[in-house]
């Protein structure tokens, strides 16, 4: 296990989640201050202390813990991660910071269905969308695995945790397009959203520009790289 202080919070990464790396290793990104930098800058810019937050794609729980530190009650956050190998690491990072947010192990989508959730040893790569470029290199990135999982919707999560979400943080490796398109009537009422768009993995018929155009009547939208910040008009 390696330990860091990042954006004012404590972060630990289990050894098994350090074994496989792609491009700049996760621990180096934490040391350099670049880990999920765009998303965290967006969150800091858009969130309010009173927000009730839905964090989709928690990974190791870094952004989740940053969010928990910025809201007045850390229990007003639900962190969702579909990769089953990361859940204990998220719980550990939550607990060492004495946060109280809930953690849900499930893929999120706009409807309920059985999907193949795909992941390997990389903590940032799991997705409903199959990433063929990550297959066939088990030595470098770990075995590429597909497991049948049932999706949950944001409305399912509101009912399960008895919350009314007002803020979205979203990094779900391509599923964001369909989620935002088909759940427009739900998300248009949020106070703010911070969404990382994954152009290379977009199997949807919608693109980032389409999503922006759909939401522009309701939000001011700014971009930081691949991350879009939606703030209620």
Tell what function each PLM region has.
Residues 86, 124, 175-179:
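Short phosphate-engaging motifs
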Residues 114-116, 180, 205-206:
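Short, well-ordered secondary-structure micro-motifs
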Residues 108-112, 227-230:
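A short acidic, often aromatic-flanked loop/helix-cap motif at beta-alpha or helix-coil junctions
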